[in-house]
Amino acid sequence: TDLKQKERYDRVDDAVCAVRSALLEGIVAGGGVALLEQSQRLSPVSLNDNHPKEYRLAARVLATALEAPFQQIITNAGIDSERVMDKVMDKGVKGYGFNVKTREYGNMLRQGVIDPTKVTKSALRNAVTVATTILSTNAIITSARTYESN
């Protein structure tokens, strides 16, 4: 059908763009692992009393936000994200994560679970921009929420 053909075209186009991006700036461990690793780099900053209180708080907030993609991917696979995240963080090996497709722990790069560096950086940069805008705004207009009653 036309819809399936358009969807297939979009997937191929996305793949081509991802490869181009990877060729430009390289790749990082996928599955949220690269962002999870960066969240760990912020822990010393958030605990260091030499930094102002606001700086430490911002580091904690950003670290928590960087953990979210990894946790969401694991949760979407129907797995306890806290348990998996603890195991990955305890291992402390660069690129080590959990492959939800094979349900195995290991090196994400070797398993082919990758993200283009440029895409990861752009997503993070855009998220920080949106968060900064929200935090510096007095009011925000969003879509109305609908609540379902049980």
Model segments located where?
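Extended, low-charge hydrophobic alpha-helical regions
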Residues: 1-150
